[in-house]
Swiss-Prot record:
Residues 143-152 bind DNA. Residues 137-162 have a biased composition (Basic and acidic residues). It comes from Salmonella phage P22. Residues 132-162 are annotated as: Disordered. It holds the Pfam family GP3_package. This is Terminase, small subunit. The terminase small subunit binds to the packaging initiation site and regulates the ATPase activity of the terminase large subunit. The terminase lies at a unique vertex of the procapsid and is composed of two subunits, a small terminase subunit involved in viral DNA recognition (packaging 'pac' sequence), and a large terminase subunit possessing endonucleolytic and ATPase activities. Both terminase subunits heterooligomerize and are docked on the portal protein to form the packaging machine. Signal peptide: none annotated. One of its GO terms (cellular component) is viral terminase complex. The N-terminus contains a helix-turn-helix (HTH) doamin that is involved in viral DNA binding. Residues 140-162 are annotated as: Interaction with the terminase large subunit gp2. GO terms for molecular function: DNA binding; identical protein binding. The lineage of its organism: Viruses, Duplodnaviria, Heunggongvirae, Uroviricota, Caudoviricetes. Homononamer; forms a ring-like structure through which genomic DNA is translocated into the capsid. Interacts with the terminase small subunit; the active complex is composed of dimer of terminase large subunits and a nonamer ring of terminase small subunits. It comes from the Viruses.
Length: 162
């Protein structure tokens, strides 16, 4: 049954739209801390084979679980888009920054201690080794001559003129 035309029932609502998931920075930080505690309390498990007195036994070994922004947003039940919006909100941006720093530090420290795969974490954190190659050829004119000679030989081999 539809509402009668011209009704103004919507004015009787105490608020419009759904209530925000986190109404304060403290509530968001508390939810983030719950995620951090959950990650620490729930490591990943790997089965390792050990040999003792000729008998092979398998034992579960706890492995560090890497914190992620995706894991955090799933845990606190918000989308990545909402998380990015929180980053822009004046009241929540400090909490978002702090949470992202905790996640970065946990990953970096875990990789440095060889508790997490350093290659995967380095890529995730945007870390890379850089080397810079500098041309130290003393006479740049010689380089240009070599280039034009190489181009000439290449073109002769392919049958092109230029």
């Amino acid at each position: 049954m539809a509402a009668p035309k011209g009704n103004r029932f919507w004015e009787a609502r105490s608020s419009h739209g759904r209530n925000p998931k986190f109404e304060s920075p403290e509530a968001l930080w508390a939810a983030c801390c719950e995620y951090f505690e959950w990650v620490e309390a729930n490591p990943l498990w790997e089965m390792k084979a050990f040999s003792y007195q000729g008998e092979v036994i398998q034992e579960p070994i706890a492995k560090m679980r890497a914190m992620t922004i995706t894991g955090l947003t799933l845990f606190i039940d918000v989308t990545l888009e909402t998380w990015r919006t929180y980053r822009l909100r004046e009241d929540l941006s400090e909490v978002v920054t702090r949470a992202e720093q905790v996640i970065y530090d946990q990953k970096f420290s875990g990789a440095a201690a060889d508790l997490l795969n350093a290659n995967i974490i380095a890529r995730d954190l945007g870390l890379k080794e850089q080397s810079q190659v500098e041309d130290v050829t003393p006479d740049k004119g010689d380089r240009d001559k070599r280039r034009s000679r190489i181009k000439e030989l290449f073109n002769r081999g392919t049958g092109r003129d230029s």
